């Protein structure tokens, strides 16, 4: 695999579907010739007379076209995804993280962060100013939402079209290097979200070059990328090299794979298995753990099983069932995909087994779904869980957070359930202080017709789900983006500050009781009363008692020292604990 294209071959491009390619670099044209390559990788072009080393703006003229297209492996696109690439090889940065030893996933806490809305400036340098805050909060990994090149000036990042570049609005690759280096100096790992299931609609020049997409084979997000058809060897290498770019050249500690349930690959060796092997190989070479995590709604534990038992060997995968069970328990919402999660028996099952649907019938899907996790092949820490994330907030009609409709007590209960679970917790930025700002779906397509179609499609999508179309914000309106930016001043006021202190106490509790993340599936003891609205579970050294109702409850046999209470009105009297409505307590068992 080619991590960095350097020397005379740095401008090579794969374009098997064209008959002529001309490299345009700093205004000069360099005719390219086809290279002789091994079977499966035919279609590479090279320029025998190429520009000298140094910063060069360049692109490619295909089949006599007078408008150049950028390189698919562009490290920099200073003028956006429709314009010339700029060389960035080798990366001119002196890393200072030689003493960084990395982190394994087990026992850690992840913080999801979108660069553009995390601060008023929306840059990596500005986000870097929050590192000490995250250390104080007790975070281990910062998971950055995609930073790759996309159409327009602001976007979630999941419709990227230039996977090798860092969006210039965030500061470009130099700012990215500074951010990762500073994170490591602060003791924080970095996980980079990537999207390998589709490409965005505009700025995507792959179809002009070769069979990179499976035309007519769309997933729910767009045309599927070509991972198993004719000519797919090179695109698979493109993906593997991209993952190696982040964990190698950019020193990140892990990669988060977006929506792997939308990755279409019918080869005998799935691309995720190849990625798992790549991560292990780089870990072996560097001596640093490289954490690969899959977002998946398949409830298929094969993702985290070892490769020697036909698994993919990833370090972790999401359990959306945990989010849904907690959401229903604290909010009472039971429509749509929340419909199977109404009983506390569901939350109890998820706490013990990781999934609700592990082969059971899903009424939302209209079919049976998932499979059980074999406890001899995976442990609960391999499941990444949350009570909110970018999808679960942003894909609601108004992008509303739990904090915009729930009380302090309900938010506190959700926090306790998440941060004392046997899984790996993930927070979404601002959750820890109950941010009142929404996180809405926003785009900035410069093409009016695409912007209009995006807005209309969003409204129709929520109309079908029963939402009032009048409440759905226009993703193209700049105010939709601006509304989604965090207001950090909230964190020091009222219940926001109170909730933040609770989160800090909970992260400290996890550090003081590492056995919370050292259980096997089925080992968490859980009891509950649906009618009374309480649930209690015992992850080894502590017992967690939760009141999920509007009435006060008294729980007997509550032995042990009180380690944490979300409300001062939760007195422990001998072996009895009184829980006020919507509160929780943690005892040393």
From Swiss-Prot:
Compartmental location: Cytoplasm
Reactions that this protein is recorded to catalyse: hydrolysis of (1->4)-alpha-D-glucosidic linkage in 4-alpha-D-[(1->4)-alpha-D-glucanosyl]n trehalose to yield trehalose and (1->4)-alpha-D-glucan
EC numbers, comma separated: 3.2.1.141
Location (main, coarse): cytoplasm
Active site (record annotation): 258, 295
Coiled coil: none
Record site: Transition state stabilizer: 391
Pathway assigned in UniProt: Glycan biosynthesis; trehalose biosynthesis
GO terms for MF: 4-alpha-D-(1->4)-alpha-D-glucanotrehalose trehalohydrolase activity
Domain of life: Bacteria
Pfam families xrefs: Alpha-amylase, DUF3459
First-tier enzyme category under EC: hydrolase
Binding annotation for substrate: 256-261, 320-324, 390-395
A GO term from the CC aspect: cytoplasm
Keywords for the protein's UniProt record, in alphabetical order: Carbohydrate metabolism, Cytoplasm, Glycosidase, Hydrolase
UniProt keyword Nucleus present: no
Entry keyword annotation includes Cytoplasm: yes
One annotated GO biological process: trehalose biosynthetic process
Similarity field: Belongs to the glycosyl hydrolase 13 family.
Protein name (database record): Malto-oligosyltrehalose trehalohydrolase
Gene expressing this chain: treZ
């Amino acid at each position: 695999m080619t991590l960095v294209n350097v020397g005379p071959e740095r401008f090579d491009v794969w374009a098997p579907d064209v008959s002529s390619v001309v490299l345009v670099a700093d205004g000069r044209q360099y005719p390219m010739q086809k290279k002789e390559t091994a079977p499966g990788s035919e279609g590479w072009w090279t320029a025998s007379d190429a520009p000298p080393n140094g910063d060069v703006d360049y692109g490619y003229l295909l089949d006599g076209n007078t408008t150049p297209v950028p390189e698919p492996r562009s490290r920099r696109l200073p003028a956006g995804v429709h314009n010339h690439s700029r060389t960035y090889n080798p990366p001119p940065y002196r890393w200072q993280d030689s003493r960084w030893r990395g982190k394994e996933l087990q026992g850690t806490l992840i913080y999801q962060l979108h660069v553009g809305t995390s601060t008023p400036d929306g840059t990596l340098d500005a986000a870097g100013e929050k590192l000490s805050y995250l250390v104080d909060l007790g975070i281990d990994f910062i998971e950055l939402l995609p930073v790759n090149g996309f159409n327009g000036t602001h976007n979630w990042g999941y419709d990227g079209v230039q996977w090798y570049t860092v969006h210039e609005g965030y500061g470009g690759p130099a700012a990215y290097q500074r951010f990762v280096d500073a994170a490591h100096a602060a003791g924080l790992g970095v996980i980079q979200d990537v999207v390998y299931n589709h490409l965005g609609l505009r700025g995507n020049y792959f179809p002009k070059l070769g069979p990179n997409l499976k035309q007519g084979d769309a997933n729910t997000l767009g045309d599927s990328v070509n991972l198993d058809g004719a000519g797919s060897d090179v695109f698979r290498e493109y993906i593997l090299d991209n993952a190696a770019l982040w964990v190698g050249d950019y020193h990140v500690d892990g990669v988060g794979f977006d929506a792997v349930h939308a990755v279409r690959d019918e080869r005998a060796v799935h691309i995720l298995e190849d990625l798992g092997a790549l991560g292990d190989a780089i870990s072996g070479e560097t001596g640093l753990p490289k954490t690969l995590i899959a977002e998946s709604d398949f409830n298929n534990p094969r993702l985290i099983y070892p490769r020697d038992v036909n698994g993919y060997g990833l370090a972790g995968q999401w359990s959306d069932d945990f989010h849904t069970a907690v959401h229903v328990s604290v909010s009472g919402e039971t429509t749509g995909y929340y419909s199977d999660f109404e009983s506390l028996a569901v939350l109890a099952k998820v706490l013990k087994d990781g999934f609700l649907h592990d082969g059971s019938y899903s009424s939302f899907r209209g079919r049976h779904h998932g499979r059980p996790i074999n406890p001899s092949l995976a442990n609960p820490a391999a499941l990444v869980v949350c009570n909110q994330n970018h999808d679960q907030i942003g894909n609601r009609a108004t992008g509303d957070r739990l904090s915009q409709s729930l009380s302090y007590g309900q938010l506190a209960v959700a926090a306790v359930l998440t941060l004392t679970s046997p899984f790996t917790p993930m927070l979404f930025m601002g959750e820890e202080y109950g941010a009142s700002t929404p996180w809405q779906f926003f785009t900035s397509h410069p093409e009016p017709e695409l912007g209009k179609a995006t807005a209309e499609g969003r409204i129709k999508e929520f109309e079908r789900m029963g939402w009032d179309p009048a409440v759905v914000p226009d993703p193209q309106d700049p105010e939709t983006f601006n509304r989604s930016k965090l207001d950090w001043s909230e964190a020091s006021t009222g219940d926001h500050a109170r909730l933040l202190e609770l989160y800090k106490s909970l992260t400290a509790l996890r550090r003081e009781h590492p056995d919370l993340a050292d259980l096997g599936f089925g080992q968490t003891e859980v009891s509950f009363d649906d009618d009374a609205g309480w649930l209690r579970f015992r992850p080894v050294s502590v017992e967690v008692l939760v009141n999920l109702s509007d009435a006060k409850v008294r729980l007997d046999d509550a032995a042990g020292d009180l380690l944490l209470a979300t409300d001062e009105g939760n007195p422990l009297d001998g072996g009895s604990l009184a829980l006020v409505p919507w509160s929780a307590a943690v005892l040393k068992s």
